[in-house]
Each structure stands twice: as structure tokens, then as C-alpha cells.
């Protein structure tokens, strides 16, 4: 499986320049069993949770905000990422490589979803900065039309940045891995890892840190409770993302150093492979966490889930569902009144999930 970043091969031994064998069979066996179970769980929860987010955003009759556009695309990125996990599970269990076209396509979806999720979380942070810190100057520019245009640009950027990760991927020796030209054999894996560390972690972290530092400073001077509640949700999404991806990026950086023989001993190589397996499980689970964050911190999303549950229960029991719609409409009118009282906080605070 082309995980980030060294490909996950199924070989039981790793050889250094002196042809000394390092046994990794027990780690490979652990990965085959544990990762297969873990991928199945992440796929199930990630699919259901992110589909609920998509339904909540697309089925609402209320007008959308630019924040909703970004949250919708974040959920779609997570769905694209999680959709590849059944194929990697099959690959781990059967030890059979995917068809060449499916190998390249699945790897492409994996990395496009990976970078797309990171980029949209970064864009959401920038949007929060504009909505809170530069509210007066950015109000006219934070429209749904602008959100759609920016989202298309983000998807294009994700495809462009992901292309080095899958352009050389093919089925080789019954495995799905990178088959690089001889001139790129040594440098291309290093460039791939560096791209993930820099564009997928360091640069977004710097941007988000700046945006949220300025946002926190602004919130200290503004006691608008509605605005603080909106920031709590978005900030929670960002913090959880980096808590789950930081260990993996550290291991990827160490894997890059391994190409330059920084870890010559077999024990260090084994520790690094164990760390890769463990941090990978933590990192990949991020794609099913955002819906739970919405349910925990987003009042409107919890309300939508209750409404959906009551509607399904009413259909199963043969009861009418008008009461639920009436209550929802009443609350929507209350939200509209609150929005009119706090209109200066800009359009972004009117997200359907916040």
C-alpha cells in the first residue's frame, strides 16, 4: 500500500547497503491483522459520519454560507480518502496487488483526499481570520460564489500537489508501489516525503497558528458569545487534526533520514517500522473524527441529527413527522432573529453546522 510515504511492502526482511538482513516479519504480520481491522472500522465510521455531514449541508432549506461550502468540501475530501481504505484492506489481507489502473487510481484518490482535507482545513482557518479579524473589510468578499470558486481552486491544487505521489505508481511484482526511473530512484522518495512534511504539515501549521493567534487576540476584546461558539468548533477541528497527524509526520521525517543511513542498526529500523504502523493508525482515523466534533460542539448539527432520527423513527412507526418540522422551523426563526441582531459578525457565523 502506498501509504505516505515509504510504500508499505509486505517483505519480511529489509536489507542495508552491506546486504545485512533485518527481520521484520512480526511487524508485517501485526500490520496485516491490526491494520485490516482498523481500516475497516475507519471506513465504516468515516463513511457514515461524513455522509451525515453532507446530508446536513445539502438537505437544509436555509441559505448556505461560505463556511458551509468549505465544510462540505472538507467532508467530501474525507470521503474520498476513506473510500480507498477497502482496497488497501483487500491488499493487506490477500497479498495480491491491485490491477495496474486501479492501483494508480486508488493511490491518486488517497493523496488527493489527503491533501484536500489539509488544504480545506487551512482555508477554513483563513476564512475564520477574515470573518473575525477583518470582518468589516472582508464581508462583501465572503460570499457563496467566492467559496465555490476558492473550493475549485483548492481541489485543483490538491490534484497538482498529489500528482508526484502517484504519477509513478504501478503494479510491480504483485505489489502497488512506485516504479521510478533510474535517475530518480534515490531522490524521488525523499522529495515525496519532503512534500508531505512541508506542504501537508509545516506550512499549514504556520498559517493556522498565525490565523488563530490573531483570532484569539480579537476574541479577547469582543465578548460576542455566538462568535466564540463558532470559533470553538473550527478550532477544535484544527487542533484534533494536528494532534493526530503530528506523530505520523515526525515518523515520515525520520523515514526520510533513513535514506541517508541515519538509522543503520536493525533495532532502530524495527522501531521505526513499529512507529510507522502505530502512528499511521492514529493519523488515518482523522477522516472519521470531524463528524463527531460537529456533533459534540455544533448545536445545529446535533439538532439535525435529532430531527433525522425522529423522522426515521416516525416513518418506521407510521407516525406523521410534521411536529418535528414545526419545531425546526420555530428554531430556525429564532436563529434568524439572532443572526439579525449580530449581523456585523459577517456571513460566516451563519453556518448550518455551528
UniProtKB/Swiss-Prot annotation:
Keyword Phosphoprotein: yes
Cellular location(s): Cell membrane
Ranges per topology, Extracellular: 1-32, 92-104, 169-196, 258-274
Pfam families linked to this entry: 7tm_1
Cellular component, GO annotation: cell surface; dendritic tree; external side of plasma membrane; neuronal cell body membrane; perinuclear region of cytoplasm; plasma membrane
Residue positions, PTM Phosphothreonine: 345
UniProt PTM comment: This protein is not N-glycosylated which is unusual for G-protein-coupled receptors.
Family: Belongs to the G-protein coupled receptor 1 family.
Alphabetical list of PANTHER family matching this protein: CELL ADHESION MOLECULE, CX3C CHEMOKINE RECEPTOR 1
Subunit (UniProt): Found in a ternary complex with CX3CL1 and ITGAV:ITGB3 or ITGA4:ITGB1.
Function description: Receptor for the C-X3-C chemokine fractalkine (CX3CL1) present on many early leukocyte cells; CX3CR1-CX3CL1 signaling exerts distinct functions in different tissue compartments, such as immune response, inflammation, cell adhesion and chemotaxis. CX3CR1-CX3CL1 signaling mediates cell migratory functions. Responsible for the recruitment of natural killer (NK) cells to inflamed tissues. Acts as a regulator of inflammation process leading to atherogenesis by mediating macrophage and monocyte recruitment to inflamed atherosclerotic plaques, promoting cell survival.
Annotated protein name in UniProt: CX3C chemokine receptor 1
Organism: Rattus norvegicus (Rat)
Amino acid at each position: 500500500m502506498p501509504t505516505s510515504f515509504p510504500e508499505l511492502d509486505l517483505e519480511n526482511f529489509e536489507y542495508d547497503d552491506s546486504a545485512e538482513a533485518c527481520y521484520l516479519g512480526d511487524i508485517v504480520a501485526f500490520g496485516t491483522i491490526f491494520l485490516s481491522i482498523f481500516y475497516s472500522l475507519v471506513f465504516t465510521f468515516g463513511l457514515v459520519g461524513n455522509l451525515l455531514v453532507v446530508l446536513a449541508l445539502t438537505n437544509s432549506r436555509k441559505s448556505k454560507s461560505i463556511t458551509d461550502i468549505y465544510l462540505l468540501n472538507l467532508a467530501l475530501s474525507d470521503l474520498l480518502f476513506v473510500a480507498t481504505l477497502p482496497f488497501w484492506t483487500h491488499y493487506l489481507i490477500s497479498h495480491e496487488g491491485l490491477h495496474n489502473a486501479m492501483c494508480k487510481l486508488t493511490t491518486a484518490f488517497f493523496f488527493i483526499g489527503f491533501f484536500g482535507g489539509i488544504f480545506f482545513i487551512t482555508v477554513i482557518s483563513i476564512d475564520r481570520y477574515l470573518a473575525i479579524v477583518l470582518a468589516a473589510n472582508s464581508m462583501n468578499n465572503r460570499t457563496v460564489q467566492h467559496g465555490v470558486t476558492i473550493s475549485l481552486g483548492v481541489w485543483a491544487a490538491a490534484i497538482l500537489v498529489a500528482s508526484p505521489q502517484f504519477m509513478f505508481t504501478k503494479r510491480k511484482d504483485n505489489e502497488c508501489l512506485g516504479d521510478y526511473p533510474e535517475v530518480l530512484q534515490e531522490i524521488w522518495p525523499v522529495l515525496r516525503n519532503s512534500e508531505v512534511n512541508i506542504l501537508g504539515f509545516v506550512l499549514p501549521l504556520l498559517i493556522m497558528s498565525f490565523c488563530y493567534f490573531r483570532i484569539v487576540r480579537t476574541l479577547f476584546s469582543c465578548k460576542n458569545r455566538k462568535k466564540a461558539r463558532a470559533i470553538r468548533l473550527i478550532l477544535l477541528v484544527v487542533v484534533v487534526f494536528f494532534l493526530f497527524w503530528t506523530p505520523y509526520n515526525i515518523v515520515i521525517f525520520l523515514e526520510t533520514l533513513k535514506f541517508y543511513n541515519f538509522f543503520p542498526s536493525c533495532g532502530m529500523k524495527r522501531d521505526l517500522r513499529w512507529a510507522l504502523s502505530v502512528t499511521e493508525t492514529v493519523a488515518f482515523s482523522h477522516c472519521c473524527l470531524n463528524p463527531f466534533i460537529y456533533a459534540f460542539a455544533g448545536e445545529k448539527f446535533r439538532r439535525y441529527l435529532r430531527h433525522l432520527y425522529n423522522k426515521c423513527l416516525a416513518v418506521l412507526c407510521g407516525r406523521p413527522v410534521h411536529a418535528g418540522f414545526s419545531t425546526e422551523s420555530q428554531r430556525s426563526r429564532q436563529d434568524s432573529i439572532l443572526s439579525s441582531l449580530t449581523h456585523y459578525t459577517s456571513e460566516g457565523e451563519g453556518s448550518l453546522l455551528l
